[in-house]
Design a protein with these regions (language model features):
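Short loop segments at secondary-structure junctions
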Residues: 27-29, 78, 85
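Surface-exposed, flexible loop/turn segments at secondary-structure boundaries
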Residues: 17, 67, 86-88
C-alpha cells in the first residue's frame, strides 16, 4: 500500500525485498520512481495509483539494476527517464536485465524493462 510520507509524496515498500517504489505529485501528475518488484506488487502499485486518482506522467529509474527498471502497462505509455549514465547501461544491458528479472521474480512485463531515456542534459523540462 502506498503510504503518504509528505505532501505529494507516497512510498510503497516491497514485501519481498527492502526496496521502495515512490510516487511524487507534480503539476501535471505523478512521477513513479523505481516501481517494482514483481508482477503482483506492480499490480498492487497500479491499484494504489488508481485509488489516488492522479495520472502517471513519467517514470524514473534511480539506477540500472533490473529491479529498478520495471514498468507495468497500467502506468501508461509515458516517458521514462534515468541519469544519462544509467540510461546508457540500461539500454546496453537490457536483455541481461530481462533475463535476471525472469529468473528472480514472476509476472513482470519483461518487454517493458529498461525502456528509459536519459534526462535532458540541460536539466529540463521533464513532465510532471
Amino acid at each position: 500500500m502506498l503510504t503518504q510520507v509528505a505532501d505529494g509524496v507516497w512510498v510503497r515498500q516491497s514485501e519481498w525485498v527492502w526496496t521502495n517504489s515512490i510516487a511524487v505529485r507534480g503539476e501535471d501528475g505523478l512521477i513513479l520512481i523505481d516501481p517494482g518488484i514483481d508482477g503482483s506488487e506492480l499490480n498492487q502499485l497500479a491499484d494504489d495509483v488508481d485509488r489516488l486518482g492522479i495520472p502517471v506522467v513519467a517514470g524514473f529509474s534511480t539506477h540500472p539494476h533490473w529491479d529498478h527498471l520495471l514498468w507495468h502497462p497500467r502506468f501508461g505509455d509515458v516517458p521514462r527517464y534515468a541519469t544519462p549514465a544509467a540510461a546508457h547501461v540500461a539500454n546496453e544491458a537490457r536483455e541481461r536485465a530481462q533475463a535476471m528479472a525472469a529468473e528472480s521474480a514472476s509476472g513482470i512485463p519483461l518487454e517493458l524493462i529498461g525502456l528509459v531515456a536519459p534526462l535532458p542534459a540541460d536539466g529540463g523540462p521533464v513532465p510532471g
